[in-house]
Curated annotation (Swiss-Prot):
It is an enzyme of class 1 (oxidoreductase). It catalyses: L-methionyl-[protein] + [thioredoxin]-disulfide + H2O = L-methionyl-(R)-S-oxide-[protein] + [thioredoxin]-dithiol. This is Peptide methionine sulfoxide reductase MsrB. Residues 8-130 form the MsrB domain. The keyword Oxidoreductase applies. Binds 1 zinc ion per subunit. The zinc ion is important for the structural integrity of the protein. InterPro entries: Met_Sox_Rdtase_MsrB, Met_Sox_Rdtase_MsrB_dom, Mss4-like_sf. The lineage of its organism: Bacteria, Pseudomonadati, Pseudomonadota, Gammaproteobacteria, Pseudomonadales. GO terms for cellular component: cytoplasm. It holds the Pfam family SelR. Zn(2+) binds at residues 47, 50, 96, 99. It comes from Pseudomonas syringae pv. tomato (strain ATCC BAA-871 / DC3000). One of its GO terms (biological process) is response to oxidative stress.
Amino acid sequence: MDKLQKTLEEWKEMLDPAQYSVCRLKGTERPFSGKYNDTKTAGVYHCICCNEALFDSTTKFDSGCGWPSFYAPLEGSAVVEVRDVSHGMIRTEVVCARCDAHLGHVFPDGPPPTGLRYCINSVCLELVPRE
């Protein structure tokens, strides 16, 4: 996969303010506010910044946390996990492997088979429905 690199100004021009704030400045959308929180549509979730395929709807589950949750990313290297020590916490940030967009965080409290919960901001995603 080829890395996609742009300046912050270039990202700012192509993203709406909410997308830019979360994806490029590592913000977080308010819980239960995202368009994909309750979505049950079958398909593949892509990065809003670079269109890289990230998560399949078959791994999405209702965690009750207020953000779309998945128990695994797509096979391969769709996402990268990065140690995050911001806000006085130690967490694992999830970023797009292609463009380094901040997507959310992963926690060790998910369902089988992985036991992981990828807690992802809706604003970072674009769902491509299955036909």
